């Protein structure tokens, strides 16, 4: 279901000069005990970003997942990029979240960085559902203009592919524009806010339960704190 999206994301990263980085030991790939599920992850070094992670879970008709978060270098104060795509094949259910994840919540920051996402929100009405995400506070590390959908096969096949492509294009444009506009948040504060994002997300990550059900608690806890949100595991 999501392999074309994965290929497009990796092609974009590579075209931008991205090179593979080492995933923590034992976390690059894991198979479920029954062999029905496999999860693979990649870590990228990309110019302008201190960390870019990608994860793909394939559990056949039961579940398909694509997740990615891009952390800009501390010298940039623009939003993180967040992608969460889940497909439950047996139920023909799509959950999609595409967002520029803001470091702070204020109008000046939104005016500076969110014109592109606002335009996408208008362009793809199937993915601007007003239903609030249940596991997260939309007023912290999420924007009001995220592309969000709890839909079905129609959205997965018709709305999501062009929205995903446009979303990546808009985020690259955001990053390119930020190169020419000095950050208004100091680098040490950006570092603190990105670390807080990891802590906040690890406490609320709705995918952790899914990973645990497929790959066990011990591996999934390590994956959560060492790969997905590494700052959450620091004392």
UniProtKB/Swiss-Prot annotation:
Reactions the enzyme catalyzes: 15,16-dihydrobiliverdin + oxidized 2[4Fe-4S]-[ferredoxin] = biliverdin IXalpha + reduced 2[4Fe-4S]-[ferredoxin] + 2 H(+)
InterPro entries, A to Z: DiHydbiliverdin_OxRdtase, Ferredoxin-dep_bilin_Rdtase
Keyword entries, A-Z: Oxidoreductase
S-S pairs: none
GO MF terms, alphabetically ordered: 15,16-dihydrobiliverdin:ferredoxin oxidoreductase activity; cobalt ion binding
EC numbers for this chain: 1.3.7.2
GO biological process: phytochromobilin biosynthetic process
Residues spanning the membrane: none
Broad enzyme group: oxidoreductase
Family: Belongs to the HY2 family.
Stored PANTHER family: PHYTOCHROMOBILIN:FERREDOXIN OXIDOREDUCTASE, CHLOROPLASTIC
Role noted for this protein: Catalyzes the two-electron reduction of biliverdin IX-alpha at the C15 methine bridge.
HAMAP family: PebA
Name listed for the protein in its UniProt record: 15,16-dihydrobiliverdin:ferredoxin oxidoreductase
Name of encoding gene: pebA
């Amino acid at each position: 279901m999501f392999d074309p999206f994965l290929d497009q994301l990796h092609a974009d990263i590579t075209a931008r000069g991205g090179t593979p980085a080492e995933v923590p030991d034992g976390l690059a790939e894991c198979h479920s005990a029954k062999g029905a599920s496999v999860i693979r992850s990649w870590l990228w070094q990309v110019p302008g970003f201190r960390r870019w992670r990608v994860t793909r879970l394939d559990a056949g008709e039961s579940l398909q997942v694509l997740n990615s978060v891009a952390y800009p270098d501390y010298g940039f104060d623009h939003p993180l990029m967040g992608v969460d795509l889940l497909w439950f094949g047996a139920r023909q259910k799509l959950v999609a979240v595409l967002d520029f994840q803001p470091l702070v919540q204020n109008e000046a920051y939104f005016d500076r960085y969110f014109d592109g996402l606002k335009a996408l929100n208008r362009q793809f009405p199937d993915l601007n559902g007003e239903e609030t995400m249940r596991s997260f506070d939309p007023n912290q590390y999420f924007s009001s203009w995220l592309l969000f959908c709890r839909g079905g096969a129609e959205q997965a096949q018709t709305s999501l592919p062009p929205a995903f492509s446009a979303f990546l294009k808009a985020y690259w444009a955001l990053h390119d524009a930020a190169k020419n506009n000095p950050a208004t948040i100091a680098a040490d504060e950006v570092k603190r806010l990105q670390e807080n994002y990891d802590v906040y997300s690890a406490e609320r990550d709705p995918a952790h339960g899914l990973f645990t059900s497929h790959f066990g608690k011990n591996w999934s806890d390590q994956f959560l704190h060492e790969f997905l949100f590494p700052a959450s595991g620091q004392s």
